[in-house]
């Protein structure tokens, strides 16, 4: 599986983007883990990777999201992000996960990526704000992998994500912009009762591969957020089945 994925990455993406990924995420990421382990031996703790919520605003109202998007907008400005990333780089970090709300609602998110070409960023996004122009900029930077959340078909997406309609199609449009510009792009899904049978299928992964997606994440719906719904949570048996499925698909 890993050989096939490596072959796809080399043949289907921009070679400069592959090099950025291998250097900033692969080699330097491995180094950051090594330095983290050395710190632990000295009873010092600083994680090898940071996941940062840069804004609480979002255009959707997804069930299971821990962010209350109805609150007043809060965001981390560029100077603060530069300081945070700079301090992390001082101890050897180079990989950062960027979360929201919806990260691309941060008006200066592209400046953050541009200011740190020696780092690699994974952005958790619904894809609605990734236009052709934005995707073109991400390709120019070469240090970003968009991870686009798709929660089910058109009906399930609209019901679960609280948008005005067309949630699925807008996410797919953002996904296509990323793939057209040969970005190393992934898709993530929060598994719950309304999408479990549809999304936890090899046919869904085959569709993503056919589209040009390079990796997929599944995570489990948690009963959290402003309007938690316990009826959406997976049973222990379903969680175990999901884990088995992921392990089998990796083989």
Describe the role of every protein-language-model region.
Residues 2-136, 141:
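Conserved alpha-helical substructure of the radical SAM core
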Residues 81-98, 106-220:
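Radical SAM/AdoMet-radical enzyme domain recognition
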Residues 68-75, 159-166, 231-234:
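Short glycine-enriched, charge-decorated loop/helix-capping segments at active-site entrances
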Residues 68-72, 153-156, 223-226:
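A short, flexible beta-alpha/helix-coil linker loop
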Residues 221-251:
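A C-terminal junction/extension of Radical SAM enzymes
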Residues 51, 66-67, 156-160, 186, ...:
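A short, mixed-charge helix-start or loop-turn motif at secondary-structure junctions
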Residues 79, 169, 237-240:
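A generic "alpha-helical surface" signal
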